[in-house]
Every structure is written in structure tokens, then in C-alpha cells.
């Protein structure tokens, strides 16, 4: 008010209107900035709200327990001990082992917190807005539990909770949104700590599922990042270079699983290659690649333009396939099977696969390619044949020669590995 009165005394109406517009503009900018910051920090606000809610619930529980402790006489009141009868000789039986040593209350608290952390992890990790906090609490309480001796009366409880955690991890492997580092920490927890408490069958299932999940990601990025302490230009994620992850990737267990999985993948490709080569013996089942799209009825009615990006890319790709002699769907599938297999064999050598296994797989692929080469050679037209269509025979011969050269190059590449 003190600022407005002088304005009316000393300024004209247009100046007052300008001041009002300027004030409205400032209010609008301030409101926009507030909304922007509110959206930017919305997740933090939700996280804080969740924490406050948890704290409030805990305080209510503590308050109820404290009231019960103070006023529930039937449960907590200490009655006066009856006087002991006077005896000259007292025979006391020796206490059992569990009665000789009382359990410290601190140890009971550790076991209780550990039990709660497992319940929270299994019940809330999927839906919580702060899953990392629940995960960290689980590992922390496992660490605290490892520092105390577990009393025999609690061993059944500990084993039961460990089994529950294992079942949850196995059943929820595909739905849990954990980071690579968190998965590795769980693997280390289940394979290096509390070994006597874990169920062996569930542990085996967990390990196999975990490795399969990790191998579905970019394994090559893992191996490169673990071997190089500097940031990789394609994979700058810090978790790839964490010491725990690096040690895990460089472990013999990881390498053995990776080699077994890769060998299985190569054998699958070899089986596919055998099936495709058998299909070549039935020419009526082959479908020629259509580079000109003569059957495309929509090409001239404006529905699809030959200049569309997808159509243009398809023309170029098909032309490249033709230049390599890949003129039908089966030879193209053979090429698309062989080429990745060669790359996988190179990776297998990087994984330090036993040389005899590597040589055996390479020889199997070379043998199949040589048989494929023989099939191609048998399709080359003889120069003594009377051609009914010189142009067709020339194109067929040209394509087969290109395909033959492609296979020869692949065999040479394999032998030079």
C-alpha cells in the first residue's frame, strides 16, 4: 500500500496502467518458474512425502507400543515373587545349553530388523517410489546379521526368511527393475554369504536366470568396460566400471556361463544353417527377392511413393543383396545366419574359450560353408549348354559367381582367425 499511494499521487493514468501490466507480467513469470521447479522436483516431493508417511506410521506404532507397555498391566506388570521355601539341601538340575547364555537384546533387535527388511523387500520393492532405499536396507541388515551369532532358536526363522527371499527373486526376475550393480550385489549375497541358509535348488535357478538376463543385454559392453577403467565412448554408465561389477565380469564363473551360452547359440545357428541348405535342394520352395516391386499395386496410385525413406532403403538393401549373389530368401537367410556366427566365434575367442572347443565349432562352420559352396558350383551353367535365354543365363551365372565368391571369402575369414 505504501508503494501504491505515491504512484497515484505522482504518476499519470497510462503510467499506472503500464505499472499494472508490468506487475502482471512479473506475476506470470513467477508462476511459470514456480510450476517449472515444482515439476522438476515432483519426484523428490513424492519421495519426501513417502518418507514422512513411513516415519509417521512408525511413530504411531511406537506410541501404541509405549502406551501398551505403560498401561497394559495384565501383560507387562511384574508381580511380586513368592518367597522360596526354606530347604537345607537344594538339588538343581544343570541348565540346558540354550539356558546357560541369555540372548542379548541387541542381537534380537538385529534379527528383527533383518526380518522386517526382507518383508519390505518382497512386499514393497515393486511398487515403492523409493526402491533403492529398500534395497540398501536389505543389504545393510544382512551385513548386521552377519556380525552376530544366530541363536539356535532363531535358525529356523532365518532359514525360512532366506528361502522366501530366494523364491521372490526367482519368481520376480523379469519384473524387478534393478540396476546391473544391484543384481551383482544380490548374486554376491546369495553365493558368498549365509551359504548354509540358502536353498541349493533355488540358488541354482536364480543363478541361471540371472546370467540369462544379463546376457540378453550388451555383453560386449560389459566386457569392454570391465577391462578399461576409463569411460568408454559408447557406454559411460558408471555402474559398468564399479569395482564390484568389474570383479564379477572378470570372474571365472561369469566367463564359464558366457562361454556355455555362446557355444549353445553357435550350435543353434549351425542347425539352422543345415536346415536352410536342405531347403536349397527344393527350388520350388525358393522365393526370389523382388527388387523392382512389380506387384506393388499402390506404387502408382499415390499411396506409397518410391521416394519414401522406407521404400528407398528397401530398394538399396535389396540391390546390395543382389550384388552379393543373394537373390532368393533362402540364400539371404543363410548369409544372415553365417555372418553373425562368424562374429560370435570371434567373441568366443575374446571370452577365453578353450581352444579345442573353438577349433571344433570353427571347423563345423567351415564344413557347412564348403558344402554350400559345392551346392552353388553345381548350379553354375555349363558353357556347352544351348541357352534359350542368353540374358537370363548370364544374370544367373553372374549372381552365382558372386555368391560363390562371398562364401569363399567367409571360409577364408574363418581360417585366418
UniProtKB/Swiss-Prot annotation:
The modification N-acetylmethionine is found at residue 1. One of its GO terms (biological process) is cytoplasm to vacuole targeting by the Cvt pathway. It is a peripheral membrane protein. The keyword DNA damage does not apply. One of its GO terms (cellular component) is Golgi transport complex. Keywords: Acetylation, Golgi apparatus, Membrane, Phosphoprotein, Protein transport, Transport. One of its GO terms (molecular function) is protein-macromolecule adaptor activity. The modification Phosphoserine is found at residue 305. The keyword Hydrolase does not apply. It is found in: Golgi apparatus membrane. Belongs to the COG1 family. Component of the conserved oligomeric Golgi (COG or Sec34/Sec35) complex which consists of eight different proteins COG1-COG8. Present with 2190 molecules/cell in log phase SD medium. Acts as essential component of the peripheral membrane COG complex that is involved in intra-Golgi protein trafficking. COG is located at the cis-Golgi, and regulates tethering of retrograde intra-Golgi vesicles and possibly a number of other membrane trafficking events. This is Conserved oligomeric Golgi complex subunit 1. It comes from Saccharomyces cerevisiae (strain ATCC 204508 / S288c). The lineage of its organism: Eukaryota, Fungi, Dikarya, Ascomycota, Saccharomycotina. The gene is COG1.
